[in-house]
């Protein structure tokens, strides 16, 4: 079951070339879907005992390439608008927003080995 409970729904808008990253939630599970435009969505796992520690995953999402992305707590994530127009992302989270529940890093922070200017294949 994808949705275990309801906390809130919110929308995030971004424009061509703009990166919104990095952040991870301590408690919140995210359920992202792109409703307008094209997004490169990136996940990074730095959990100490995770079998996927150090892995990066890129997803290219749009209404034409629909993917519901579920991000569990403690996974770094972010996105970049890769289309030519505004993109809008919807998130159906399982807990309401709390400011002290989220960690943030700059998109170019070297703690995450990712370059937003390239695509991993």
Where would I find each of the regions flagged by the language model?
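Non-catalytic, conserved peripheral segments adjacent to functional cores
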Residues: 1-68, 82-121
């Amino acid at each position: 079951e994808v949705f275990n409970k309801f906390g809130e729904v919110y929308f995030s808008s971004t424009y061509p070339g703009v990166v919104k990253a990095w952040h991870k939630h301590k408690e919140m599970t995210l359920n992202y879907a792109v409703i307008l435009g094209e997004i490169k969505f990136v996940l990074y796992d730095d959990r100490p005992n995770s079998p996927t520690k150090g892995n990066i995953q890129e997803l290219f999402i749009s209404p034409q390439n629909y993917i519901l992305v579920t991000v569990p707590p403690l996974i770094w994530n972010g996105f970049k608008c890769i289309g030519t127009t505004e993109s809008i992302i919807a998130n159906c989270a399982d807990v309401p927003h709390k400011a002290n529940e989220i960690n943030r890093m700059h998109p170019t922070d070297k703690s995450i080995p990712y370059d937003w200017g390239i695509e991993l294949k």
